[in-house]
């Protein structure tokens, strides 16, 4: 990134509509590398650093020269990008061509370019002289989207901007695909990746390190936001390597069914969803049922003497005594004394969603816009509510998050408990979350960090003095109390295989994290910085941000104010051009946020420049909607 741009800002105010200095510095780098040099870039910015806005600002710059195609994982994230595109446009302060920008979900892009599951090669010519931006790029490989991206790269010879806060999902294989997509050479994976008998023995070898450094030199942008404006994280439970884990000791009932399930799988259980199920809760005949829909149709089917299922509805005293789930027993007991909002991660949405819904209802927590809990717990005279988010939710997710994130819900009085499967691990932002729970162990530690990153990020908390509590729950045997302090104690299979599934999973993830961290440190070292005058294509964007910062602290100045002129000439060296720019923003009534007047416009009054507050007003029930296409980004759901 261009550190010369960062040096232009002093005590940057982040609390107003703004482009952060590192975002502008990165934008400069992207313009130079992708537009000027036609080279691909991996934007490896850690979660919460504002990758989306950087990408959209770049798309606006690039739209003046080329067509820009933006690919996002799903329809919900597409909505987020479309919303943020409006934010980026308002901050851009320069010309762009909106109809040159196309935003697609991966599924819609697939349907646009495939006929009967075969790539329509004749149609790929439309992508000549274009740029592709791929959000969550680590997720596109191993499927048709990844195949299509490779074909487009080879056929059209175009650059890619790949966004990822965690470019290695499970093994270095993902990084190998990223290298292949970004470089002009074909990668032989067998030469750069060494494979052992286990997944955790998949490593980037020395040749792979050299290939990485050679092919991606000058193509990596790494950034991690300083944590100075974040609340303290308080991890609960006993020490487990470099983190903390809450041991939830199973009852005899849960442990019995847990062991039956594990023996059925012959200990080959690391990725089997049934082990995720029974580690969360046991449900008798449901434990080994891969198609739950068949059992959901049963009438008054007994799972245990005090637990039955009827047409997909669980009922019985066991939902309160909770011998079926050591994790939920801990959770239900703990939340009774906690204040604030909760975010709870779980996997296997069908099984997990069933368990969660009826345990919560039976223990006095009401479903948001749904069933009321038994003897409901109250807050401010209203029932404490929960919602369950899964991939099946599409149209309602955005509205649900609006309620959860609203200032009126900071205390959880509107919606207190948000349960979510993997759909919430990427791209979404949660606000004022005080308790984060893991009901199941994530597949990777990058996913674990992504889930934390949905909540613990800059601008998500009004009061950062209050800590955020994290509970990583592990179901363990009734007599299991091992202290896990070193990976070196668990190098032999016979020692690992007898461990509870959750503990084994955590160790497995930690082994993989060693390789991930090694590669991340290489990428971090490859990220280049330089100090140059800003690229001509972003000068107006940069000046707009400098002006916003200046007039936040200045409500009224002389028209020939030396500080304002000095600030503008730090970018536009010619004083006459700088004065002309000042004339333009005053006569054009540039929009600023002032600490006294809030939303304001710049005006000339006699020999002064003043900030004039404004408010939009309209007649009741009278709205004007502008449908001119030059104001609308072309998009497809």
Swiss-Prot record:
Q: Where is the signal peptide?
A: none
Gene Ontology CC annotations of this record? virion component
Q: Which residues form the Helicase ATP-binding domain?
A: 32-185
| One Pfam entry name | ResIII
Q: Where is the Helicase C-terminal domain?
A: 327-507
The EC number(s) this enzyme carries: 3.6.4.-
Do the record's keywords include Thylakoid? no
Could you say which residues bind ATP here? 45-52
Where is it mainly found?
A: virion
Motif (DEXH box) spans which residues? Answer: 135-138
Q: What protein am I looking at?
A: Early transcription factor 70 kDa subunit
Organism classification: Viruses, Varidnaviria, Bamfordvirae, Nucleocytoviricota, Pokkesviricetes
| Gene, per the UniProt record | OPG118
């Amino acid at each position: 990134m261009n550190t010369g741009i960062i040096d232009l800002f002093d005590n940057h105010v982040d609390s107003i509509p703004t482009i952060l200095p590192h975002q502008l510095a990165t934008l400069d780098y992207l313009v130079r590398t992708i537009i000027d040099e036609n080279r691909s870039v991996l934007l490896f910015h850690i979660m919460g650093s504002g990758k989306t806005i950087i990408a959209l600002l770049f798309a606006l710059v690039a739209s003046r020269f080329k067509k820009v195609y933006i690919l996002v994982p799903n329809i919900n994230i597409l909505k987020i990008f479309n919303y943020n595109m409006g934010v980026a446009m308002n901050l851009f302060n320069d010309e762009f061509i909106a109809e040159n920008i196309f935003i697609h979900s991966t599924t819609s892009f697939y349907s646009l370019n495939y006929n009967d599951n075969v790539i329509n090669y004749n149609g790929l010519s439309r992508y000549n002289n274009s740029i592709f931006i791929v959000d969550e790029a680590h997720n596109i490989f191993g499927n048709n989207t990844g195949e299509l991206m490779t074909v487009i790269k080879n056929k059209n010879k175009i650059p890619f901007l790949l966004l990822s806060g965690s470019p290695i999902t499970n093994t270095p294989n993902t990084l190998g695909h990223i290298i292949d997509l970004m470089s002009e050479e074909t990668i032989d994976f067998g030469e750069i990746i060494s494979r052992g008998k286990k997944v955790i023995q998949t490593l980037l070898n020395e040749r792979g390190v050299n290939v990485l450094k050679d092919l991606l030199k000058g193509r990596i942008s790494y950034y991690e936001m300083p944590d100075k404006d974040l609340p303290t994280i308080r991890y609960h439970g006993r020490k487990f390597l470099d983190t903390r884990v809450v041991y939830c000791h199973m009852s005899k009932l849960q442990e019995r069914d847990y062991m039956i399930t594990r023996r059925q799988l012959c200990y080959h259980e690391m990725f089997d969803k049934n082990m995720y199920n029974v580690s969360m809760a046991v449900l008798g005949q449901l434990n080994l049922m891969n198609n739950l829909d068949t059992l959901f149709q049963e009438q008054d089917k007994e799972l245990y003497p005090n637990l039955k299922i009827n047409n997909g509805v669980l009922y019985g005293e066991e939902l309160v005594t909770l011998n079926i789930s050591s994790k939920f027993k801990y959770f239900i007991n703990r939340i009774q004394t906690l204040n604030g909002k909760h975010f709870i991660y779980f996997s296997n949405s069908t099984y997990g969603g069933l368990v969660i819904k009826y345990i919560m209802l039976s223990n006095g927590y009401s479903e948001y816009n749904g069933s009321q809990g038994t003897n409901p717990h109250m807050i401010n005279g209203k029932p404490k509510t929960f919602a369950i988010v899964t991939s099946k939710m599409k149209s309602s997710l955005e509205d649900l998050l609006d309620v959860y994130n609203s200032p009126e819900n900071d205390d959880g009085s509107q919606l207190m408990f948000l349960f979510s499967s993997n759909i919430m691990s990427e791209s979404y932002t949660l606000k004022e979350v005080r308790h984060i729970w893991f009901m199941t162990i994530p597949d990777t530690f990058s996913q674990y960090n992504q889930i934390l990153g949905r909540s613990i990020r800059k601008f998500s908390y009004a009061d950062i003095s209050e800590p955020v509590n994290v509970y990583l729950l592990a179901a363990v045997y009734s007599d299991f109390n091992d202290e896990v302090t070193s990976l070196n104690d668990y190098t032999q299979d016979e020692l690992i295989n007898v461990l509870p599934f959750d503990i084994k999973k955590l160790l497995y993830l930690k082994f993989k994290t060693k390789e991930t961290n090694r590669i991340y440190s290489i990428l971090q070292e490859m990220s280049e910085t330089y100090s140059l005058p800003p690229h001509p294509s972003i000068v107006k964007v940069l000046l707009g941000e400098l002006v916003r910062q200046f007039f936040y602290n200045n409500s009224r100045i002389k028209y020939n104010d030396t500080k304002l002129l000095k600030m503008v000439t730090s970018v536009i060296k010619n004083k006459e051009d700088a004065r002309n720019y000042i004339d333009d923003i005053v006569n054009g009534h540039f929009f600023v946020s002032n600490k006294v007047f809030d939303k304001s416009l710049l005006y000339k009054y006699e020999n002064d420049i003043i900030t004039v507050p404004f408010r939009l007003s309209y007649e009741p029930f009278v709205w004007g909607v502008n449908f001119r296409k030059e104001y609308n980004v072309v998009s497809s759901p």
